[in-house]
């Protein structure tokens, strides 16, 4: 049997692609080395932010706006919504390059972003403390996503639509042959007209030439009371310290507030090097500088987890076909800010499988930029 599309890596992007391609009428096989959603990639830990006025560059805004439409649609398939519109407050010094990019993206795309000075920030959210030279850019329409619920939903919907799924089955090789691609697994060989490689952190085990560096990261949950909950209108947030360190976090749920540091981490070369939380000395204290200065009412660390970023050299995505193989699409290098785009990236992969041109300018994400 020859599939229309085989997906290698069925985490965030792969799960979305499996659903959207199957829904479009294609014969699809989803493969994953584990049973998604799982703890071995970048999608676990309950929640991920979604921001529209994008501080990483306005080239992402059309993608994230389409992603939001797809998240809203996905939320209709569950009693518990995948997307929670908590609002996101972006905090930092008034001369922050990241905040300047947020403001520019908002202006270019007429997005609702409210600028607050330090006094206004503390007045609205007394739990937050910032220096006098800080500003906040508040995105009322943004919020957070329930990442594992999203993947569970896509996988369920894809299966119900007739998608074949092969999990707990690593891929060992890919062969390009004539008019198709053969994927070699522990379970046998499978062929397709086209392949999506969305293998996340460990994509280099299949494609060692890709410029992707795995980085071990951690996030943790800290003791928090009802003041920090979404019921009290406490928002999700990003925060930049005066030294440039970047943090992100979420409203407290069940008296626990989740926070992580975006920059930093440990470069690794294999899965065994991704040590569990607390096995690196700095894990438990990584968020302390932010919590002490910005959220001083937060209590002790309750628990945490480690994950991985698949970083590209410029921390922009890689969305491109393999050189010389137009039937093989690679989506990788999401660099720790990719989950919010998983829905639209899955749709892009489904369009690729159908032979449709991309609905977006993907030039900034081509592999050729690294030559």
Swiss-Prot record:
HAMAP family noted in UniProt: MTOX (MF_00515)
One Pfam family here: DAO
Sequence similarity: Belongs to the MSOX/MTOX family. MTOX subfamily.
Assembly, per entry: Monomer.
Highest taxon of the lineage: Bacteria
Function of the protein: Catalyzes the oxidative demethylation of N-methyl-L-tryptophan.
Binding site for FAD: 4-34
Record keywords, A-Z: FAD, Flavoprotein, Oxidoreductase
Catalytic reaction annotation: N(alpha)-methyl-L-tryptophan + O2 + H2O = L-tryptophan + formaldehyde + H2O2
Enzyme Commission no: 1.5.3.-
Free-text comment on the cofactor: Binds 1 FAD per subunit.
Protein name as it appears in the record: N-methyl-L-tryptophan oxidase
GO CC annotation: cytosol
A molecular function (GO) term: sarcosine oxidase activity
Modification S-8alpha-FAD cysteine occurs at: 307
InterPro entries the UniProt entry points to: FAD-dep_OxRdtase (IPR006076), FAD/NAD-bd_sf (IPR036188), Me_Trp_Oxase_MTOX (IPR023493), MTOX (IPR045170)
NCBIfam families: PRK11259.1
Cofactor(s) this protein cannot do without: FAD
